[in-house]
């Protein structure tokens, strides 16, 4: 009997040791699961932040095409100048018109009126210059026809 009791007690001690090892493994799994959960939460936050950033980049890129078109339109006016115009100085591209978006902004109205006046003056100067060029061309043609007569 003594031997049976010893066998039972060693068997019980062995099972207790196995259960302790299993408990340690489960505690370790729980610890690693907690760490993994924290890392996944951090990853989620970073992905949300990246998603917001990509939305901002997408907005900028969608507007970039409009910026390029505006610059292109402003530069088209440079094509009408001749080499003589470049001798006095490089001509500037066409002015871009600003459109007021806020109706309650009085300062914006003043700025817009000033810009419109400058644009009108610029257009008037351009038209006067063009009519002057046309008059000079007509005078040349008249002089040439008078020599041929």
Curated annotation (Swiss-Prot):
It is found in: Nucleus; Cytoplasm, Cytoskeleton, Spindle; Chromosome, Centromere, Kinetochore. Transmembrane segments: none annotated. Residues 107-140 have a biased composition (Acidic residues). GO terms for cellular component: cytoplasm; DASH complex; microtubule; mitotic spindle midzone; mitotic spindle pole body. It comes from the Eukaryota. Its main location: nucleus. Residues 7-56 form a coiled coil. InterPro entries: DASH_Dad2. Signal peptide: none annotated. Pfam families: DASH_Dad2. Keywords: Cell cycle, Cell division, Centromere, Chromosome, Chromosome partition, Coiled coil, Cytoplasm, Cytoskeleton, Kinetochore, Microtubule, Mitosis, Nucleus. The keyword Metal-binding does not apply. GO terms for biological process: attachment of spindle microtubules to kinetochore; cell division; mitotic sister chromatid biorientation; protein transport along microtubule to mitotic spindle pole body. PANTHER family: DASH COMPLEX SUBUNIT DAD2. This is DASH complex subunit DAD2.
